[in-house]
A protein has these predicted regions:
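Short helix/strand-capping turn motifs
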Residues: 294-297
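Catalytic core of soluble alpha/beta enzymes
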Residues: 154-291, 305-317
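N-terminal capping/lid subdomain adjacent to the active-site entrance of alpha/beta enzymes
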Residues: 1-173, 180-187, 192-195, 308-328
Length: 328
């Protein structure tokens, strides 16, 4: 029996405007994919990202283009041959995992031969704002074990971190420049931030300029985000970074994410598992990939006004294992 593929666009308003170095947004625009074999269906969600030349239209077009192939070979390995890494493949890959688990009447991790996931502690992200405002938000969230701070390279980033550390002195900090710094700013900030509770700096330089990181000291762990997509990009990161950020919208799904995690660990990289801003449906596969990671950034639903039905349970910054009614 032929499978049925349904593709939907969804808009999820954010709790407040979220700003990074490249711009801001008030709504998360996602695409969901449902794949049904007539009796059971699996779901996946992705976030088309302009940084990677993705739009809602382009991602939809990619998914529509492979429906004939999915009818012939509805399997994840074949999917990797017909779609490149990216948001479209992520939604389909995760939907196939969900469908396979339902057909096997087991949880996804059992199907994959993995141990059952445990609850994870996620960072909580503060978008870019004036130093005083970010300091206020840090105080409101000072009970959280780890905060992630978006930076811009506008000359006020040290003031931001200083104010945040003052208002949340016992909280670990992760700084994310989203490619917004120069090498001079990195050299200036890194040793100073180390004294302010910062444990990691994420993607300080533009991806096409990160070779400069290989020739300077790293007083704080440096993590590749925009420079790291899938296993094919991994070897080029050696000597520049100590950690990689695995996002399923970059890897093209959980299948590649699990392989990237293993390959990166074998090369000595620490692991971070991150996300775009999406609902719990997008976070649930990330929770599987995030087992044992040094840093987990799966706070997307906490930034939304509302989450979808059967969403993940967050107790403070702790994420509990997803219900099978959600995914997997």
């Amino acid at each position: 029996m032929a499978i049925q593929v349904n593709i939907n666009r969804e808009s999820w308003p954010l709790e407040s405007e979220f700003r990074i170095s490249r711009g801001s947004r008030k709504v998360s625009e996602v695409i969901t994919v449902s794949i049904s074999d007539g009796n059971l269906s699996g779901r996946g969600e992705c976030f088309p990202y302009a940084r990677y030349n993705e739009t809602l239209d382009s991602v939809e077009k990619q998914i529509f283009s492979i429906i004939p192939e999915l009818n012939e070979k509805p399997c994840r390995e074949y999917l990797r041959k017909v779609l490149p890494p990216g948001a479209a493949r992520n939604a389909v890959d995760c939907a196939l995992w969900d469908l396979e688990a339902k057909k096997a009447n087991c949880r996804m991790w059992e199907l994959a031969g993995l141990s059952a996931p445990e609850p994870l502690t996620t960072v909580y992200t503060l978008g870019v704002d004036e130093p005083e405002k970010m300091g206020e938000l840090a105080f409101e969230n000072s009970n959280r074990p780890i905060l992630k701070l978006k930076m811009t390279g506008d000359g006020f980033d040290f003031d931001r971190v200083e104010r945040i550390h003052k208002n949340a002195p016992n909280t670990k900090l992760v700084v994310d420049a989203n490619e917004g710094w120069t090498i001079e700013q990195y050299v200036e900030y890194a040793p100073r931030f180390k004294k302010l509770g910062v444990i990691m700096i994420e993607q300080p330089l533009p991806a096409d300029q990160d070779s400069q990181l290989a020739s300077i000291p790293h007083p704080i762990t440096v993590c590749a985000d925009e420079s790291c997509h899938d296993t094919s990009t991994l070897k080029g990161l050696v000597g520049k970074y100590e950690m990689i950020n695995i996002k399923l919208d970059k890897t093209g799904g959980l299948t590649e994410a699990l392989e990237l995690k293993e390959a990166a660990s074998n090369l000595g990289f620490q692991i971070m598992v991150g996300c775009m801003i999406g609902t719990s449906l997008a976070m649930a596969p990330g929770l599987v990939a995030g087992q044992g990671a040094s840093v987990v950034d799966l706070d997307g639903p906490l930034l939304l006004k509302d989450d979808r039905e059967h969403g993940l349970e967050f107790i403070g910054s702790t994420i509990n294992v997803p219900s099978s009614l959600l995914w997997g």
